[in-house]
Amino acid sequence: MEAFVISRLAFLVAVGLASFAGSVVLGRRFVKQPERLRVALWWLLAVILALSCAWVNGGWPFPPRESQHWIGYVLLFAALLRSIDLPTVQLISALASAALGIVVTLLPIAQNGWGPVMLGSWFFVSLVSYLIVRVVLHKEFEIASLRASLLLAVPLFVSAVMLFFAGSAMLAELAVAGGIAVAAAYLSQRSSALGHGFVEITLLFHFLLLLNCTIYADLPPVLAWLQWIVPALVILLAQPLHLQKWMTRRGHYIAIVVGLGVAECVVGLLFYFVVKPTAPS
């Protein structure tokens, strides 16, 4: 048991160090090439998260045997699409990546009892939910502020607790790894280079973790959906404050951070009372 815990802690430390050191090295390598730095950083995150999936899954099976084995492949596919410098590809990259991730997640259960209507309903609702959050957060990540990093990392850490008590310790470990990777990257690279490609990889990763736990473990769909929309909801609720003349930039920043904390506490309490969590066996 002690060796198991040590190996897991070592894995999480390695993720943080790789993300931090990799971001520092890439920042110095492409200091005068911001566009190349953007591409390099989202590839770094995609590779780190894909390797994390392989570690947690005990290998990199091909073809994947379970839905969660697909997560790493989907992230690399998303990074590849974002790297293609064509306007059309850039426009559809989020749609194509999310659609692929949803299909490979739903396909195993669809082959074992779901009808076309059920499959289509889940696909449509999942895709719309992903795109809504993606669109709402689009402008938030033009610069790499502490606020932006909190909107990405904090929900991942909260989701890790929910995933664990919903019956999936493996997905919970991946969520923690994702939160650490994102936080480390923002600590080492405070520039606009951590833009939309980086955000897209992070959001897609978080979304697929929640979807997998909803379908194949015991995370209630409504709670998963609420947890998913928390960052977008916080931004939308804070927008009217930004328009007030008396609201300073710092005040708006504090309002978003406080709103994020309150929203996550509410979701956590709902999860506690609905699921009545116990440690998975």
Describe the function of each predicted region.
Residues A3-A18, G58-L75, A110-L127, A169-G179, ...:
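Structural signature of hydrophobic alpha-helical transmembrane segments
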Residues M1-P63, V257-S281:
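N-terminal signal-anchor module of multipass membrane proteins
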Residues Q33-A46, L86-I102, G115-F123, I132-F207, ...:
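Cytoplasm-facing juxtamembrane segments at the starts of transmembrane helices
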Residues A54-W60, T105-N112, V161-G167, C213-Y216, ...:
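Juxtamembrane "helix-exit" motif on the non-cytosolic side of transmembrane helices
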